């Protein structure tokens, strides 16, 4: 979640008056950043992860699990931890962890550091341990040395954590990513109540059912006007309720997401959801469901919280230059649907099993601010897959940008006039075709030479599967791209594996000069396929057959084929078949001549990716679905009741604590 500005937000009728002003000045801010930083070069590639979690309150007597609405109290306590220990060098901690092989001792170190890192570092002799990660520049903060940071998210039951500084560019940096994630979880645990758990699950399986919050609150709020989610689940910072209300007001009706129900043996057919309060007349929008917004045979959701209340795993890369960032943006775009399918973790919504496994289309619907008229002319929600490639690489052929794209013509003309190339200008004009959703009255007048707030107002509320991020004014941060499609995983081991795999793939793309370009329409088709229940086994995905530099491009139409996830990651078992992304990543790994310990660790992560792709172990979605459908109290009616939900949460917590399940984690952990 981006920077939260303090001030007085405008409601939608007032905001509309300033939309053109914000767009005009946002473009001016972009031009100033571009002119200032276009020549900026970075010595090394840096990266970082964002992990979101849900805080669950467990009631062992009633066997109920509910989301805890104590985000503000928890973050205040975590903020004090950060401030208290921000001068501590965590380097010796990671050195000690890297040299330890006993799982119990590793856990003990993490537990001690989570309570008081200063005491632990002093006890082991401070910086005397020589086995630390080499830092390129001693003047720059590094994830190894910094206290982790914690941030608010949309839901009052959610937390976001990041390393306190970026990871470096060496393979050795990968050896403490998982420890950093585990430490963040331990720190959070230390600031929770005894009955609370921080779980990295994509969504709470009974979100929106009666009594799902702790404390219990009735769903009758005027902000979202939801049948199911009380306004109390929304972060109290004024940005979030304003965003929620302004999306509803701009579109002229409540948001509406309909996910197909999974039909089991005893599921009601046709499924006309009995939990929808069809006759409620508390707000004018209550008629939406009766008027067709709620579809039969689907799970109906009517609030932004059903989407923005989901957790995900995001990776940000700092490139060496603007050109390299644009190339990475393009080359990783075809990877986004593949990683969405491989990370699938969302088989249930609002207490029902769904006939899909991913969150993406639910979030897209949750922030879809298009009016009914715009639905006919604007193809996508502002949260969706990438629409345009943006690099000037000669392999970026015009025919690859083959989907209709709405742009703001005035913004485009201004960018072209100021010497921005056509591809980047079109991308920015597309981003600026949307309206700004939250405008603060205190922040309308800005100095465009020192502020990027108007630019970020639009860039940060276009939630695409990749995001292009210019350097912010007055910082030493470089040109960045953000990989946004992955679902959060249950364990820190999995989240580290997925993060490191994507980072290594990005390095391989640059190192081997790979060409992954394909028509955007095929990427869109892949995004839809990724949502399918058990997409890994039931769907095929378009991809470029030969990504290597020496591949012929004479017949572009024959360059793309549909492959299974197994074939895409593990390769085709035939002559001249696709080698597999894992083969490419391994080639990069061994070209770097890492030490044996580093190879051993990274191979564990690669094996998890490989086994997920070939079905030797399950995706989180399949594992959760299997748990639900085999639970003694499951009635084959698609309902995830309180008992199932409670037991599932308990089982997940045990796995996180080390009671590994080979069906989920394979033989890698």
UniProtKB/Swiss-Prot annotation:
It comes from the Eukaryota. Pfam families: GCS. One of its GO terms (cellular component) is nucleus. It catalyses: L-cysteine + L-glutamate + ATP = gamma-L-glutamyl-L-cysteine + ADP + phosphate + H(+). InterPro entries: GCS, Gln_synth/guanido_kin_cat_dom, NA-bd_OB-fold. GO terms for biological process: cellular detoxification of cadmium ion; cellular response to cadmium ion; cysteine metabolic process; glutathione biosynthetic process; phytochelatin biosynthetic process. Belongs to the glutamate--cysteine ligase type 3 family. Catalyzes the ATP-dependent ligation of L-glutamate and L-cysteine and participates in the first and rate-limiting step in glutathione biosynthesis. This is Glutamate--cysteine ligase.
